[in-house]
Structures are given as C-alpha cells and as structure tokens.
Amino acid sequence: MRILLTLLLLVFALFAQAQSSSLQGVLKDAEGAPVVYANIALFQASDSVMVKASASDDAGKFELQGLKPGNYYLKAIYLGLSDLYATDLTLSESQDLNLGVLSFSPSSIELAEATITASRALVEVRADRMVFNVEGTINSVGSDALSLLRKAPSVTVDNNDNISVLGRSGVLLYVDGKRLPLTGTDLSNYLLSLPAEQIDRIEIISNPGAKYEAEGNAGIIDIRLKRDKSYGANGSLNSTYSQGVYHRANLNGTGNYRNKLFNTFMTGGIGEIEGFHNMDFDTYLNNIYQHETNNSKNASKNYNFRVGTDFFIGKNHTLGFLVNVGENTSQNTSTNRITLSPEETPAAIDSILIANNKADNNNKNQTYNLNYRFDNGKNRTLNIDLDYGRYRNTSERYQPNQYYNATETTLLSQNINAFDTPTDIGIYSVSADYEDNLWGGKIGGGFKITNVVSDNTFLFYNVNVEDGIYVQNDSLSNIFKYDEKVFAAYVNYSRAFGKKWNAQVGLRTEKTDAVGDLQTFRSELQEPPVVQDYLSWFPNAGVTWEVAPQHALALNVGRRINRPDYNVLNPFNNRLSELSYEKGNPFLLPEIVNNVELGYTLAYRYNLKVGYSVTTDQITRLIAPDEDDPRASFITWANLAEQKILSMNISAPVQITEWWNAYFNISGSYIDNQADYGDGAVVDVQTYNYVIYQQHTFNLPWKLTGEVSGYYSGPGVWGGVFIYESNWGLDLGLQRKFLEDRLNIRLSASDLFYENGWDGYSDFNGMYSEGGGRWDSRRYSISAGYRFGNENVKSRKRSTGIEAEAGRVGQ
C-alpha cells in the first residue's frame, strides 16, 4: 500500500507540473566559457516580486519550471562579473521558452549588498557525484551524521552501522575532503557525535576520477561541514534539544573574519547524547538452540573545534593552515542474556548465560593541515598539502559471564573477564595537484605520499571472583602494530569535442608497502609478520554527449581498490560474551572493483543512472561457529571470491504548485555474492533491493515552512550472507524565520511510526541465525539558530590531504 501511494503521488506530481511553462538558457562569460553555479532569479515585470530562484549547472545551463503565463524579467549574479539582465520576457500557456546563450560582462566593482539567495535542490545529480544538500532541511534538526546517511540516496547503513552505496561495501568516508581514519564502533561514535546542524551537504561520489584516491570500491562519501561564506565579521549560533526515550542536546557556533590580507574562520560545538540499541537473536548451531537478547544503553559527551586562517599573498597565492580537534567520552552498559537448550526441544532450557557488560570509552582526534594554493585566475592552478593526523582511543570493559539453571535461581558457574584496548594511530601525508590548459583541453596531474602507523594493544584479564584481582591472560592478549606506506601518482586529461561531446581519461598508480606485526606475550604463539607489497594501476574514463536539447548521456568506467580497515586486521578476540565475539583477519587481501555507469539526464533535472560492477576478493563480514566450543560463534572478515552488482537510480525534483515542491529518488540493485571456503562453507546469495525516498516542502501561511519526508526500503543483503527485511520511516518538520531571517526556529519529528528498525537472517556454514533490532530512532526535536554580522562576500573553501586514511581508523 505504501509503495502504491508513493507511485500515485509521483504520477500526480508529474502531471501537475506538465501544465506549466518553463524558461531556460545558458550563461557564459565574455570569452565564451560557461558560468557555473551563478545565482538566477525571475521577477514579475509588474511589481518586481521574485517568482523563482535557481542556479546554473556545471555547463552554465539553467532552467526555471512551473511558471505561470505573464511578463517577467530575469537577473543573474556571479562574483566578479556584472549583473546580467534579460528583460521583456513574455510566457504563454504551456510554453517552453529558450533564451539561448546569455553573456556576462566583466566587472571592476564588488557586488552590491542586495543579493539574491538561490534555494538549492535537496539532491543534485552531477556527472560524477550525487549531492545531498542537508543545510536548511527541517527534518535534519536534532539528527546526526549517521542518521542522515541512512536517509541519503543510494546509501544503506546496516544493523552494525556498516555503510554501502548501491549495494557495494567498501565506502571511503571523508569529512571536508579529508579521509576519516575510523572504522567500526569508533566510526559510529564519531558520526553519532557529529550534529546534523554542522553539516552543509553530503557528496556521494560513486565513480571518482584519477585525482581521487583509488581507495574505496564503492566510491567516496564526503561530508561537507558548514563554513561561513561571507566577508567581514560574521557568525552563527545554533542550539538543539531532542527527546526520544533518552535525550540529546548540542550547542554549535561558527565565526568568520575576512579582510584584504587574511581570512580566519572557526567552528565548534559541544554535545550530549543518550541512546539505546536492543537486539534479539535466535541461533541454531551444532544441535543447540540459543535465544539471545542484548539491551544496551550509551551515554556520551563530546566536543569538536575547527579553526583555520588563509593568508592572501599577492593576487594569485594563498597560504593557509587548518586545525581540527575533537573528543568523545562515552559509557556503555548492556544486559546480555542467552538461553541454551537442545534444538529438538527449545522449551527445555539447559542453562542461561548472563553477561552484563560495562565499558568506558574515550576517543580523541587531532588533524593539522598546511596548504599552499596558486591560481592565476584563468587556467593554471597548483595545490600543495602537508597533513598530520593523530587518533587515540581507549576502551576499558568489564564483562562477567554467569551461568544459571533454567529458573535462574542457582548460579552454576561464573567467569569474569576484563579488557583494556588502547589504540594509537598516526597519519602523515604530503600531496600536490597541478592543472593547466593543453591542446584545447585541461590536463591535471599530481602525487600523494601517505604513511599510516597503527599501534593496537589488546589486554585480556581474568578477574578473580573472590578478591577482584585482575590477572592478565597472556594467551589471549597481544599487541598489533601496522605500518602502511602508499606512494601514488596520477594524470588526467579532459576536453570538449564540438558543442555536444566532452571526454576525460585518467590513470592513477599506487605502490603499497604494508606490514602487520602481531606481537604476543607467549613466544610459542608468536607468528611472523604479514607483509604485503604490491603495485596497482587504476584507469578511468568518461564521456558526455548532449544527444539533443535537454537530453544528455554520460558514460563512466573505472577501477578501484579497497584495503582492509586497520581494526579488522587484528586477530584478537573482542568478546560480547563467552559465546559471542569478534576477531580480525590479518591475511585479508585488498578488494578490487571494476565498474561502469551510464547516466541519462532530461531537462537538466531528471536523472537516470544504471551501473554494473564486479568485485574480486570482496571484504565481507561473516558469522561462523567456534572451532573449540560447540556453543560459541564469532564474527570475522573474509574475502569473497566475487560479487556482481547491477544497480539503478532515478531522481526527480518536481514543483507541484507554487507552494509545494517535492523530490523523489528511487534506487534498486541486484546483488550476486559467491565464495567457497571449503568444508561446506559456501556463499551463494542472490537478492534484489530497492529504496524509495521522497521529500515534500510546503510554503505555508504566516511565513511557515513545512516538510514531510520518508523512505521505504525493500529486502536486501548486508555483508555476504545476512538477508534483511523491509523497513520504512516518516519524518515531519516545521520552520519559521524571524528578524529578517536571521533567527530560525525549527520543530521536527523523526521516525514517527517507529519502523526504522531491522530484521533478518543468515544461513552459513552450518549455522542459522535470525533476529532484529531497534534503537532510539523516534525523536522530537526543537532547534533555534541565529546568524549575525556582515553577509556579503564569500570566503575560500578547502580541504586537507588525509581524509582517505582517516576513513579506515575505526573511531
């Protein structure tokens, strides 16, 4: 029924739009080059009331739809160029008026203070990426980065917070163009501690070019944080309170000062988060039936601070530095209960294991960037980055394992364990990128050298039941050191062929030297280091063709690599209880993906993309039985022989009426996972998945803005073998601005019907497991934001050079 309503609403929206008129054109400068992302506004000729606002795309093209018949004039604004006007425009019923090429003139003065702000589309589809514009969406209030990723088009977040794009795992996560060296629980904690109010947009780059690192077989997700874009002294403050079963609160601020010599900017925030995650599992293993319930609560406090300065050294040179620091401190308590009984008679309970965990965690991160940029203002640029990042995590966990009889009245036995697992990761990087014109096109090249040093200590303690003394278990404790060096270089060339064809081709090479050294506390358990030394080549190419006016095709092909996250290489046993644990695999190979994408764009707005990828040695998460204890199972990582994915994505922004705008996104994929590990451990999984997402924005009376958004996800597969069932969610929001739009008050409700959970099953290697989970997803939030200061001129945006490595740390 939900799917039928969605399709009916889509048909109605398209029908309603078809009755209106449209206006389109192309913006170019005096030399005939496209003017991209210029602000465009259409006014009524009678009273100069603005009717519609937009922006030009990558080719300088723009289109205004949903217009009524009448007389208008158009104004286009771009920094450094004189304002452009097109007057005496008359539209009749159902007319599509093409203004052709509109040319700007150079400007010798700054823009006037009166500017027109163009509202961005929720999702922009470009040749190489999809941009999810978060800033300004009401339903992002009180949310966090992880929740926003669940809503992002083509993105899936599974029950263990693993992220995939169009069914492909191995996503590289960036923040402001810099790789985030975190994985696993550490990454989840970071994303949960990053308020949505600090996020400007999320860029999903499914097929990056040679300039980008080859890491990440599903591409790159780049979370772009807000940064004030104005000259002078200005800033903002935002405070949010959110209530579900537990509360969340945060306070965030930005500041910016710019003059002719330098630009200084800063952002910062503090937050407090409480939440829960409840899971329920039934497992059948070695003729034993286990029913497990795990209810966990997490309470954390965090802060983050970001400051930078750009010095303008002459007309063409900029020297800048950027510092990021953050800390997240959390306490996690969980109640874990497992009943054990014969598989034939599940009701005849043999014993019950109670394993209530308590953990204290602290995650600290610091990154430093020094940047030099040369730009001659025409065609030649040089960018150099020096980066250093430090990520330190500590975790102390106390875990009693107590076995009771079937009525939980008699303690049969107990075994108390404790864990101390500090991690220290250092990342060093230097990179340079150069671009210039050549042979009627543009050539680019560069290099990057990265060194990652990871020191992971895992100390396992047996706790004496009588006196509480901790005794280190040398057989289960270890130190894992990982040293990885990557030397990369690339070249890329692009040019236009006539007015309808554009092509680009690139080649990147990466030399990887990595050593994983597991140091044990008992000499008889010591194994030699695992050494990996390989050279890889990553070609890519793309071509775009304007088939006809308002019809364009884009074809992209490429090859990528995904190296294992640092934490999944460590083979220590990270226990949830004596019967359930995780352990890494130091022999994991990098996975290689070859992919091809074909995109079609209609009227510069409606987009269809079809992709096909083949991944060899795909790194996947599997649940397997323990070799020694027939009751126990563990989670580990292994390489699949092959994964094939056929994917599709459709996006359509629609203006239904003057006061009602909508966005629709439909994505689907077919996934085929294959592997044979011997002894009957076979992976042979084929599944379909689809996700329907839509957002509706309403301009209401009394200057109110309303928002309704929701998604429906069909069944699919997580990792190699876990088949999940469908789920859906609905969000509501309301916004009102005051004080000349400087004060913004927002109310929102997330997952109103509490359906954003998960259920599923896996059947692998003689072990069948099914279960589900829920978290604190239904929330009600209120937010207040205030902007102050001068808001006229833009400041420079830039990123650092270690985002890719940071994505593998696991924070």
Predicted regions and their residues:
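Short, acidic, small-residue-rich periplasmic hinge/interaction motif at the N-terminus
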Residues: N39-F43, I77-L79, D96-I138, D158-N160, ...
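Short, acidic Ser/Thr/Gly-rich low-complexity loop/linker segments typical of extracellular
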Residues: A45-K61
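N-terminal periplasmic accessory domains that precede
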Residues: V101-S103, A145-S147, L187-L191, I204, ...
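Periplasmic plug
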Residues: V125, N162-N207
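Transmembrane beta-barrel wall of Gram-negative outer-membrane proteins
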Residues: Y246-E274, N278, I288-S334, N363-Q366, ...
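Outer membrane beta-barrel strand-and-loop segments of large Gram-negative receptors
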Residues: T293, A418, I427-S431, V471-N478, ...
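Face-selective signature of the C-terminal outer-membrane beta-barrel domain
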Residues: N304-N328, N357-L518, E546-Q550, Y606-V610, ...
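Outer-membrane beta-barrel signature, preferentially recognizing the C-terminal barrel domain
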Residues: N357, N478-E484, Q532, I561-K609, ...
